[in-house]
A protein has these predicted regions:
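Cytoplasmic-entry segments and transmembrane alpha-helices of multi-pass inner-membrane transporters
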Residues: 65-100, 125-133
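Short helix-to-coil transition segments within interhelical loops
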Residues: 131-137, 141-161, 187-189, 200
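Hydrophobic alpha-helical transmembrane segments of polytopic membrane proteins
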Residues: 191-232
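Membrane-embedded alpha-helices of multi-pass transport/permease systems
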Residues: 61-67, 110-139, 162, 169-177, ...
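Hydrophobic transmembrane alpha-helices
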Residues: 60, 84-90, 100-103, 113-127, ...
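Loop-to-helix entry region at the N-terminal start of transmembrane alpha-helices
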Residues: 42-54, 101-122, 162, 206, ...
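N-terminal, non-cleaved signal-anchor transmembrane helix
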Residues: 1-56, 230-244
Length: 244
């Protein structure tokens, strides 16, 4: 309960700060002029669109690939696959975004590819861990009941691994929200346009006008995904977690 109070208070503070800065007409005439509400809302929408598109692609790649490397015929690929994704995230986000520009050109596609690379590891790693850590006795029991490999995956493994997979998606989403600030450097849209305008013009309030809603967006999406994670967790797993 206390954690939720802290999150809501922080979110209210960030939103209040954003509203206050955006409604300022001037601070020292000719020195500071905030971005208009229309610019702020359009940038927020573009930022959210980039994050959601990158996450959908990262999920479509990371979850199946994480499951695939748990299978007997593909376990030898675990180290190179997880290791490759780890290398992708260990490289600074600015470097990845800069690399995409000469490869794919400036524009939306370069930003999306960079965000997918940077957000893939948590989803891939948690998908692998969620499936790999399931008690083999459960899988054997399902196989003994005559279930096929596909049925075991859909009806047994995925429901049990879902909380771990959702945790990876939540972490990836929060990372992507922050990384998307830099997408403006390769022609992407989003709140990074406001933040970097403040950086280049040395206006702290303009930086806050872009950074505060970005932080609020990360907190909001993280909270929503955490609630979805709890809702999708099987009741038996919740009871087991409370007893442990």
């Amino acid at each position: 309960m206390r954690r939720y109070v802290v999150l809501i208070s922080l979110l209210a503070l960030l939103l209040g700060l954003t509203i206050w800065i955006t409604n300022l007409e001037w601070i020292k005439e000719g020195v500071y002029k905030p971005f208009a509400w229309s610019d702020l809302l359009n940038s927020t929408r573009a930022h959210l669109e980039m994050v959601l598109m990158a996450e959908v692609i990262a999920i479509a790649i990371g979850v199946p690939l994480g499951i695939l490397v748990t299978r007997p015929g593909f376990k030898k690929l675990t180290t190179p696959v997880i290791g490759g994704a780890s290398v992708g995230q260990s490289v600074p986000s600015l470097a990845i975004i800069a690399i995409m520009a000469p490869l794919l050109g400036f524009g939306f596609q370069s930003a999306i590819v960079a965000l997918v690379i940077y957000g893939l590891l948590p989803i891939l790693r948690n998908s692998y861990a969620g499936i790999n850590n399931i008690d083999p006795a459960i899988v054997e029991a399902a196989r003994g009941m005559g279930m096929t490999r596909g049925q075991i995956t859909r009806k047994i493994e995925l429901p049990l691994a879902l909380p771990v997979i959702m945790a990876g998606i939540r972490v990836s989403t929060v990372i992507t929200v922050g990384t998307a600030e830099l997408a403006v450097l390769v022609g992407g849209a989003g709140l990074g346009r406001i933040t970097l305008t403040g950086v280049f013009s040395r206006q702290a309030l303009t930086i806050l006008q872009g950074a505060a809603p970005t932080a609020a967006l990360a907190i909001t999406l993280g909270f929503i995904l955490e609630r979805i994670e709890n809702w999708m967790t099987a009741r038996g797993l919740k009871v087991k977690a409370q007893m442990s």
